[in-house]
C-alpha cells in the first residue's frame, strides 16, 4: 500500500456545515429521533470513503452505528447526538465537532452572545473533544490491533487537528471571550503514547529465572527488532508522512534500551555481564538491529547513536581487557602446571603420526585464540587491543614454560619417559612457531622476541638428547691425537658408525627438528675434529707430511659432509670448514697461505689469530716471521660482524 498523506485521508470541510443548536432544539431532536432514526447515520456517511450497499456494516465502525445510508440529506447532529456517537466510538463525529468548534468561534467573534453562554457552549465542545481524543488515542495506542479503516480514521482526525492547530497559530490570538484551546497538540500526545507503549513492551521481563542481564538484553533486542519490523511493514503504509511513525517508535525504543543499559552499567558487573553489555552496545545493536535487512533503510539515517556514551564504553572496554588478560594468564598457568605434573609423574607423551606429542601448545593456542575471537566479536578494534595485551602475556608464559622445562631436564633424568617427554616438548615449539607466524602478523623483531624462549627450550632439549652421544664420541675423537693421526680414516669410520647407530633415537622428532638436530650434530663433528687438529701435538716439518695430512683431512671432511647431509643436515655453511684448513696445511707459499686465511676469515668471522696459530703450528717448516706475516692478515678483518652461526667461538685454544 502506498503511503497516504493526511490530506488524502480527510475530506475537506464545508463552511457552516454544522450550526450550533440550543438545548431546546436538542430536546426536540430527541423526541423526533425515533421518527428519524437514520438521520445521524446519513450525516456520518459523508466521512466514509467508498460506497457500500445499504445495510452493509463498515469495518471501521461499531455494528450498531451501521445503518442504511441515504445520501447527504438530514439535519446536522446535536451535541447530545455527537456525544452519543463518540461514546460508541464513531470517529466520523470528528468533522461535525470541528464544525461546531468553528461555529462557536464565529459566534464569539461576531458578538451578541453573552460571555456566560460562550463559556457554557465551549465547555460542551471541550467535553466532546475529550471524548474524541480518548477514542482516537485509544485506537493509536494499539494500532496493530485496530482494523485498517478505523486506524485511518483516527489518523485522519489527528492530521485534521494538526492542521487546525497550524491555522489557529497563523491567525494569532483572538479577542473573543473564549478560552484558548489551540494548539491541542494531539500529534505530540500520540508520540507520548508511543513512548509509553515502548516502555510497556520493553519493560516486560523474560520468564522467571531469566533475569540475568544476558537474558534481559536478548529480550530487549528481540522485542525492539520485531516491533520495529512490524511498524515498518504494517504501520508505515497507513500513517501519514508527517507522523514519522518509524522514527517515533525507533527513538522511543532506543531511549528505553539505552536507559536500561545505562542503569546496568552503573553496577559492578561480572566478566560475563561486561562482555554481554559490550557485545550488545558495540555489535549486536548496531549490526543486527539498526542495520538489519528490514530496518536499515529506515533507521540508518536517523542518527539514533550508541546505547552508551563513548566514555562509558571505553571504561567497560578497559575492564574487559583487564579481565581477559587475567583469565588468559590463569588458564595458561593452569595448563602448564598440568603439563609439568605429567612430566614429574613420568606419564608418557601421546604419539601422533609417529611423533611424540604434547597438548600444551594446542591448549595455549586455543586460550589466546579464544580471547582474541571474543574481543573481535565485540569490535575489530577491541580485537587489535587485546592482541597487544596477549603480546605481553604470551612471552611471559613462554619464559615460565622454559623455566619449568629446564627444571624437568635437571630433575627428571632417571624417569623412564624422560627422553620421550623432552622430544614432545621440542615438537611443541613447531606448533607455537607456526601459530605465531601465521596468526600474529607482528614485526620480525617482535616475533624474534616471542620465539626467544622457545629457541632456548629447543636448544637445551637438543643438548639433553645429544649428551650421551657426545660422551660416547669423546674417546673416539681422542684417538686422532693419541695415534698422532696415524689412522685418521679408520678413526672417523668408528665415529660415523657410532653416530649412525644412535640416530633412530631421534626419529620421533618432527622432521624440521630432526634436521636441526642433525645440523647440531654436524656442527659437533666438525668442531671436535678442529679441536683435535688444534691440540698442538702434531708438528710436521716436511711438505710431503703436510700434504699427506691434508689429504686425510679432505677425505674425512667429505665423509662427514656426506653422512650428515644424507641424514638431513642443512648445514651447507659447514662444508668449507675442514677443506680450507686442509688447504692451509698443504700450501707452502706464505703468500698463498695468507690469501687462503683471508678467504677463510670471511666465511668464519670468529676464526681468530689463536685458532690460526694452532693450525700453523702443525707446519713445522714455517719461520716465526712467516707465521707473524700470515697472522697479520686477520688484522684487516677485525671489523667484521659477529657470525650468525658460531663455530670457532665454540673452540677454546691457547
UniProtKB/Swiss-Prot annotation:
<comment type="function">
    <text>May play a role as a mediator of inflammation and angiogenesis.</text>
</comment>
<dbReference type="GO" id="GO:0051601">
    <property type="term" value="P:exocyst localization"/>
</dbReference>
<dbReference type="Pfam" id="PF06046">
    <property type="entry name" value="Sec6"/>
</dbReference>
<feature type="region of interest" description="Disordered">
    <location>
        <begin position="50"/>
        <end position="78"/>
    </location>
</feature>
<dbReference type="GO" id="GO:0030154">
    <property type="term" value="P:cell differentiation"/>
</dbReference>
<dbReference type="GO" id="GO:0000149">
    <property type="term" value="F:SNARE binding"/>
</dbReference>
<feature type="compositionally biased region" description="Basic residues">
    <location>
        <begin position="28"/>
        <end position="38"/>
    </location>
</feature>
<keyword id="KW-0221">Differentiation</keyword>
<dbReference type="GO" id="GO:0001525">
    <property type="term" value="P:angiogenesis"/>
</dbReference>
<dbReference type="GO" id="GO:0000145">
    <property type="term" value="C:exocyst"/>
</dbReference>
<dbReference type="GO" id="GO:0006887">
    <property type="term" value="P:exocytosis"/>
</dbReference>
<dbReference type="GO" id="GO:0005615">
    <property type="term" value="C:extracellular space"/>
</dbReference>
<keyword id="KW-0037">Angiogenesis</keyword>
<comment type="similarity">
    <text>Belongs to the SEC6 family.</text>
</comment>
<protein>
    <recommendedName>
        <fullName>Tumor necrosis factor alpha-induced protein 2</fullName>
    </recommendedName>
</protein>
<dbReference type="InterPro" id="IPR010326">
    <property type="entry name" value="EXOC3/Sec6"/>
</dbReference>
<feature type="region of interest" description="Disordered">
    <location>
        <begin position="1"/>
        <end position="38"/>
    </location>
</feature>
<dbReference type="InterPro" id="IPR042532">
    <property type="entry name" value="EXOC3/Sec6_C"/>
</dbReference>
<keyword id="KW-0217">Developmental protein</keyword>
Amino acid at each position: 500500500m502506498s503511503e497516504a498523506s493526511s490530506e488524502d485521508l480527510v475530506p475537506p470541510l464545508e463552511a457552516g456545515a454544522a450550526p450550533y443548536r440550543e438545548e431546546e432544539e436538542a430536546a426536540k431532536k430527541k423526541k423526533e429521533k425515533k421518527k428519524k432514526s437514520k438521520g445521524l447515520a446519513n450525516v456520518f456517511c459523508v466521512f466514509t470513503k467508498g460506497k457500500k450497499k445499504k445495510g452493509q456494516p463498515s469495518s471501521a465502525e461499531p455494528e450498531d452505528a451501521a445503518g442504511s445510508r441515504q445520501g447527504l440529506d438530514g439535519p446536522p447532529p446535536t451535541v447530545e447526538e455527537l456525544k452519543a456517537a463518540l461514546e460508541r466510538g464513531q470517529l466520523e463525529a470528528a468533522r461535525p465537532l470541528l464544525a461546531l468548534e468553528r461555529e462557536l468561534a464565529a459566534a464569539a467573534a461576531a458578538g451578541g452572545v453573552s460571555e456566560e453562554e460562550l463559556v457554557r457552549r465551549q465547555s460542551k465542545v471541550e467535553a466532546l473533544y475529550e471524548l474524541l481524543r480518548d477514542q482516537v488515542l485509544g485506537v493509536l495506542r494499539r494500532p496493530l490491533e485496530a482494523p485498517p479503516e478505523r486506524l485511518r480514521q483516527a489518523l485522519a482526525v489527528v492530521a485534521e487537528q494538526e492542521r487546525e492547530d497550524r491555522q489557529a497559530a497563523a491567525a494569532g490570538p483572538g479577542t473573543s471571550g473564549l478560552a484558548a484551546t489551540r494548539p491541542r497538540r494531539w500529534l505530540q500526545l500520540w508520540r507520548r503514547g508511543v513512548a509509553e507503549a515502548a516502555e510497556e513492551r520493553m519493560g516486560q521481563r523474560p520468564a522467571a529465572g531469566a533475569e540475568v542481564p544476558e537474558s534481559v538484553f536478548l529480550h530487549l533486542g528481540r522485542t525492539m527488532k520485531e516491533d520495529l519490523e512490524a511498524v515498518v511493514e504494517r504501520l508505515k503504509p497507513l500513517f501519514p508522512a508527517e507522523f514519522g511513525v518509524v522514527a517515533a517508535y525507533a527513538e522511543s525504543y532506543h531511549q528505553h534500551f539505552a536507559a536500561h543499559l545505562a542503569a546496568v552499567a552503573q553496577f559492578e558487573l561480572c566478566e560475563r555481564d561486561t562482555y554481554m553489555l559490550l557485545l550488545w552496545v558495540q555489535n549486536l545493536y548496531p549490526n543486527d538491529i539498526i542495520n538489519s535487512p528490514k530496518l536499515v533503510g529506515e533507521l540508518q539515517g536517523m542518527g539514533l547513536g550508541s546505547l552508551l556514551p563513548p566514555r562509558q564504553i571505553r571504561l567497560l572496554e578497559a575492564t574487559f581487557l583487564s579481565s581477559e588478560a587475567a583469565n588468559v594468564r590463569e588458564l595458561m598457568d593452569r595448563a602448564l602446571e598440568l603439563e609439568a605434573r605429567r612430566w614429574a609423574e613420568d606419564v608418557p607423551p601421546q604419539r601422533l603420526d609417529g611423533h611424540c606429542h604434547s597438548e600444551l601448545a594446542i591448549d595455549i593456542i586455543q586460550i589466546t585464540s579464544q580471547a582474541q575471537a571474543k574481543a573481535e566479536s565485540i569490535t575489530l578494534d577491541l580485537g587489535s587491543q587485546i592482541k597487544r595485551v596477549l603480546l605481553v602475556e604470551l612471552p611471559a608464559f613462554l619464559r615460565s614454560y622454559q623455566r619449568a622445562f629446564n627444571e624437568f631436564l635437571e630433575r627428571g633424568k632417571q624417569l623412564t619417559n624422560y627422553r620421550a617427554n623432552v622430544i614432545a616438548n621440542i615438537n611443541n615449539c613447531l606448533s607455537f612457531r607456526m601459530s605465531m607466524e601465521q596468526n600474529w602478523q607482528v614485526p620480525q623483531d617482535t616475533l624474534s622476541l616471542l620465539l626467544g624462549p622457545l629457541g632456548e627450550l629447543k636448544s637445551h632439549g637438543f643438548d639433553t638428547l645429544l649428551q650421551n652421544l657426545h660422551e660416547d664420541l669423546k674417546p673416539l675423537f681422542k684417538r686422532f691425537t693419541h695415534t698422532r693421526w696415524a689412522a685418521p680414516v679408520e678413526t672417523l669410520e668408528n665415529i660415523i658408525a657410532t653416530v649412525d647407530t644412535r640416530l633412530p633415537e631421534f626419529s620421533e622428532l618432527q622432521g624440521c627438528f630432526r634436521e636441526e638436530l642433525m645440523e647440531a650434530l654436524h656442527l659437533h663433528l666438525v668442531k671436535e675434529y678442529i679441536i683435535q687438529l688444534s691440540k698442538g701435538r702434531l708438528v710436521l716439518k716436511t711438505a710431503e707430511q703436510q700434504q699427506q695430512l691434508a689429504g686425510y683431512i679432505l677425505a674425512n671432511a667429505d665423509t662427514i659432509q656426506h653422512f650428515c647431509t644424507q641424514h638431513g643436515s642443512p648445514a651447507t655453511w659447514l662444508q668449507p670448514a675442514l677443506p680450507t684448513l686442509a688447504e692451509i696445511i698443504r700450501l707452502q707459499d706464505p703468500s698463498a697461505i695468507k690469501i687462503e686465511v683471508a678467504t677463510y676469515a670471511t666465511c668464519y668471522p670468529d676464526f681468530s689469530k689463536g685458532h690460526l696459530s694452532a693450525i700453523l703450528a702443525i707446519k713445522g717448516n714455517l719461520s716465526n716471521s712467516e707465521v707473524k706475516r700470515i697472522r697479520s692478515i686477520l688484522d684487516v678483518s677485525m671489523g667484521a660482524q659477529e657470525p650468525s652461526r658460531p663455530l670457532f667461538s665454540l673452540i677454546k685454544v691457547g
